[in-house]
A protein has these predicted regions:
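Intrinsically disordered, low-complexity coil segments
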Residues: 87, 106-108, 134-135
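Compositionally biased, low-structure terminal segments
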Residues: 92, 102, 113-116, 133, ...
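Acidic/histidine-rich, surface-exposed loop or edge segments in extracytoplasmic proteins
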Residues: 97-112
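Second-shell loop/turn segments in exported
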Residues: 110-118, 193-198
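Signature of long, low-cysteine stretches enriched in small and polar/charged residues
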Residues: 113-176
Length: 215
């Protein structure tokens, strides 16, 4: 996916996209810097996300982002309700030490930091902010709060933030995550600040509450 995502604008418009120019138009975390994408239906039942180490239940049908060319970052998966320009939910399902949230060219001047298993919540949120700025095209990003929150039976965190992108649209997000046995588990919602964030927040909270660790 291209945009960001988890994990925020890194995908694209509703059907397919190619190239880094689409980065500022989407809300998602994983994926590569090139390739085409499509969507599949997520039904209201328990489903595994990412590489299968976490499962959740959506309160209503969602669209799961899939790649046609080039493989996804297996630990990261993205959903949308109204299209990635308006809203997105990203899942990181047990990312191991030294792994990336998004595939990157090694020759790129700016790099999103890799996850480290000893990262603190402030360091994880700094990694996510870097994803938004470097790959998502955010021109301004503000942390609204960072606080402890239980997640998957562990001591986790909740990060609330908002960002202005190159398309001049303010978006707001919330990430809930924890590092368990050295792996990052995280669910992130990012949506247009006007209407879409508040409308989708109850869905996000229901999905977070339903999350189960399988790996």
């Amino acid at each position: 996916m291209k945009g960001r995502g988890l994990a925020m604008k890194v995908l694209t418009s509703l059907a397919v996209v190619a190239g880094a120019a689409a980065l500022s138009a989407c809300t998602g975390l994983g994926g590569s810097e090139y390739g085409y994408s499509s969507y599949g239906l997520v039904r209201v039942t328990r489903v595994r996300v990412g590489d299968g180490q976490m499962s959740v239940v959506a309160p209503r049908p969602y669209n799961r982002h899939r790649r046609i060319l080039f493989s996804d970052v297996n630990d990261v998966e993205d959903w949308t309700l109204n299209g990635p320009i308006l809203d997105g939910i990203s899942f990181v399902s047990g990312m191991k030490n030294n792994r990336e949230l998004i595939r990157q060219r090694r020759t790129a001047d700016q790099q999103v930091p890799r996850f480290r298993s000893d990262m603190t919540p402030p360091e994880i949120t700094a990694m996510l902010e870097s994803l938004y700025r470097v790959k998502g095209g955010a021109v301004d990003l503000k942390t609204l709060s960072l606080q402890p929150r239980p997640f998957l039976g562990a001591n986790g965190f909740q990060w609330d933030y908002e960002h202005l992108d190159q398309d001049e649209l303010w978006r707001r997000g919330r990430a809930v995550g924890a590092v368990i046995d050295g792996k990052l588990y995280l669910i992130l919602m990012d949506a247009a600040r006007s209407h879409y964030y508040d409308a989708e927040l109850p869905d996000f909270e229901a999905i977070v509450a339903s999350a189960q660790r399988l790996g």
